[in-house]
Amino acid sequence: MNYLVMISFALLLVIGVESVRDGYFVEPDNCVIYCMPSSEVCDRGCKHNGATSGTCKEFSKGGNVCWCKGLR
């Protein structure tokens, strides 16, 4: 059993774990970026900050805000 744990741990170190997350696109003061129903501004801003894509999340709890997928 100990060998299995050690081998699993070694594989994680060798392979490397790269994780991404989804989340709101925010300004430096941690305020969300509001958007109009057009997702182009969100997509450009999210990609500029390392995400794979961005969209305008309409009618959410905080209003129309930018949502990014795959943030690094």
Curated annotation (Swiss-Prot):
Disulfide bonds join 35-56, 42-66, 46-68. GO terms for molecular function: sodium channel inhibitor activity; toxin activity. GO terms for biological process: defense response. It is found in: Secreted. Keywords: Disulfide bond, Ion channel impairing toxin, Neurotoxin, Secreted, Signal, Toxin. Residues 1-19 form the signal peptide. Expressed by the venom gland. Residues 21-72 form the LCN-type CS-alpha/beta domain. Transmembrane segments: none annotated. GO terms for cellular component: extracellular region. CDD domains: neurotoxins_LC_scorpion (cd23106). InterPro entries: LCN-type_CS_alpha_beta_dom, Scorpion_toxin-like, Scorpion_toxin-like_sf, Scorpion_toxinL/defensin. SUPFAM superfamilies: Scorpion toxin-like. Has the structural arrangement of an alpha-helix connected to antiparallel beta-sheets by disulfide bonds (CS-alpha/beta). Belongs to the long (3 C-C) scorpion toxin superfamily. This is Probable neurotoxin pcD-1008. It comes from Androctonus australis (Sahara scorpion).
